[in-house]
Amino acid sequence: MSERKIPKEVIEEVERLREEIEYHNYRYYVLNDPVITDEEYDKLMRRLIELERMYPELVTPDSPTQRVGGKVLEGFKTVKHSVPMLSLDNTYNEEEILEFDRRVKKTLQEAEVEYVAELKIDGVSIALRYENGKFVLGATRGDGIEGEDVSENVKTVRSIPLRLRKPVTVEVRGEIYMPVDEFKRLNDEREEEGLPPFANPRNAAAGTLRQLNTALVAARRLDSFIYYVVHPENYGLKTQWEALQFLKELGFKVNPHSKLCKNIQEVIDYWREWEERKKELDYWVDGVVVKVNRFDFQRILGETSKAPRWAIAFKFPAEQARTRVLDVTIQVGRTGVLTPVAELEPVQLAGTIVKRASLHNFEYIREKDIRIGDYVFVEKAGGIIPQIVKSIPELRTGSEKEIKPPDKCPVCGGKVGKLDPEEVALRCLNPHCPAKLKRALRTLVSREALDIEGLGEKLIDRLVDAGLVKDIADIFYLTPFDLAQLGPGIGQRTIAKILQEIEEAKKRPLHKLITGLGIPMVGQKTAKILAEHFKSLEAIADASYETLKDIPGIGPEIAKSIVEYFRNPKTREIIEKLKKAGVKLEERVMKLDILKGLTFAVTGTLKNFTREEIVEFFEKLGAKVVNSVSRNTDYLIVGENPGSKYEKAKMLKVKTMSEEEFLEFVRKRAELKGYNFDEIMRSWKEWS
């Protein structure tokens, strides 16, 4: 049987879709400057998936569809590095960095030496190889000589291109890391599932990269920064600074905070600045990497068997403090997981007073040998979450008490145990435990979800304790009489305000409700994807695993979690109660024609919108958004610190307006078409 002939137009469309999707991946994940909406991106991806299903012989390793994961690997092959991946020597003080500078200048016989200062990302070192611009290998550092081939997992990292912007054969190196928000989300999820949390973002990134299930890797949203070109002389590069610009041109994500320093004092100033500012970042850094800028100087300086002599890691001080464990309390999570929490003698740590630290689970307590009364070292995992890293047995007096697992739930007195023998966490097994319900209600009424400000933590506790709320849907059935029963402090005005907020919450956008349901692995971004795709909660509840897993941004692991959540009869009962209470279960489509027929571009930073939000706002009002200014552009919106688009707009005589002028322009156009501008902005804020 002869091979079937694939129509030429299909081959051309597949190639065009791949190029277009990779371009939009680059805009979104590398430049953080998207030019299309999520809905438009999903449409492109769905079309490519459809064509590759029809013509599987067209699937290639560098297709964007290969990023979503789904393979289960048997193991990782060992690969030899083309050039050893050396580690760095460390220094922790300014005197040692000055000594490093003196050694460098003495060897080179130079009065001053230029350095490149780069933030030291707390992640996993990675080597990436490309042939004719196509990704062929991703390998971990390993022992520096050999590493593991983790190519399939690397493909799931959206900021790492599968095709370069130039068809070069090159090997580069960098860091794969886990953003702080993702680290926190993952650890919260692991604790809810009874799994041990990761100690820090580096461990989380390393553990994720070594997963055999690529779908799980894709679900964890790793990111990257690339900073090194192997054999830079092959590309005419003479300095590290030139190499960073070259990496940007190829389409890699390069850390925007790297700095070219004229001398070592500028390096020290840079280190001091980022030691103060590091908490502004959405990734964890533990110091500054200092590199001699010129490659000819690097070759003269050479390296030892372990580390280069032309670079050093200038580490930030460890954020650790010593304190004492006064007591241990136990929290009950939304899924019943019992989390022991150490009550500490207050101690100053990384700019805040720390009084409590999670002990994660009783296995963690046993391994660390932590007791009530112990002196312990506390640090902030990933710079955010206080945790005990070790006890100090040498300081024990004999009065310390062992911390024993409870034999019943501290809240309801119900039976405790494990759902699975592999679990490390204990759970309350009582399905009616009020602590579970309280946590679920806090998620539902939070600002990110239905935003019912009047239902604070204390009031939720009182409602559950009084038996007035038995599941999350019950808050929509509360009456003035119910609230009045809660006793003093709840007056008529407060009751009216709470009921008004609950009534308004019924009209919130669908993605806010989905966020509030607390579906495992479904955060705000995934909730928006689901709402835009299905348009109703009932459609999501009825969706099959096969349908869900193929939606861009969902994937197999999240799909499995969604299906399991809606398979529960109690969930179906809650949806029915929400519907009867008048809670909006459909997505309100905000699509107006106020700016129909107009083309806009944006430059600079806006006050009221992120770049992604302004693109969505234009789309919702019927406008077309472009990334570059041309004679076909009607208006350029100019924010703070505008770029080259502003000069081009002036040259082409394209009309420009400030953000304030733009909003006034929308107001006038809305009124002309019979729309209420304030209502539009209110609806937009609710939706976004």
From Swiss-Prot:
Lineage: superkingdom: Bacteria
Listed binding positions for Zn(2+) are C409, C412, C428, C433
Q: Which reaction does it catalyse?
A: NAD(+) + (deoxyribonucleotide)n-3'-hydroxyl + 5'-phospho-(deoxyribonucleotide)m = (deoxyribonucleotide)n+m + AMP + beta-nicotinamide D-nucleotide
GO MF terms on file? DNA binding; DNA ligase (NAD+) activity; metal ion binding
According to its UniProt record, which residues of this chain constitute the active site? K120
UniProt xrefs under Pfam families: BRCT, DNA_ligase_aden, DNA_ligase_OB, DNA_ligase_ZBD, HHH_2, HHH_5, Nlig-Ia
Q: Which GO terms describe its biological process?
A: DNA repair; DNA replication
List S-S links within the chain: none
**InterPro entries named among the record's database cross-references:** BRCT_dom (IPR001357), BRCT_dom_sf (IPR036420), DisA/LigA_HHH (IPR041663), DNA_ligase (IPR001679), DNA_ligase_AS (IPR018239), DNA_ligase_CS (IPR033136), DNAligase_adenylation (IPR013839), DNAligase_N (IPR013840)
Where does this protein hold NAD(+)? Answer: D38, E39, E40, Y41, D42, S87, L88, E118, R141, E175, K291, K315
Q: What EC number(s) does its UniProt record assign? A: 6.5.1.2
Domain BRCT, by residue range, is 590-679
GO cellular component term of the entry, any: cytosol
- Identify the cofactor(s): Mg(2+); Mn(2+)
Q: Does Repeat appear among the keywords? A: no
User: What's in the keyword line of the UniProt record?
Assistant: DNA damage, DNA repair, DNA replication, Ligase, Magnesium, Manganese, Metal-binding, NAD, Zinc
What is this protein for, i.e. what is its function? DNA ligase that catalyzes the formation of phosphodiester linkages between 5'-phosphoryl and 3'-hydroxyl groups in double-stranded DNA using NAD as a coenzyme and as the energy source for the reaction. It is essential for DNA replication and repair of damaged DNA.
Give the record's family classification. Answer: Belongs to the NAD-dependent DNA ligase family. LigA subfamily.
Q: What is this protein called?
A: DNA ligase
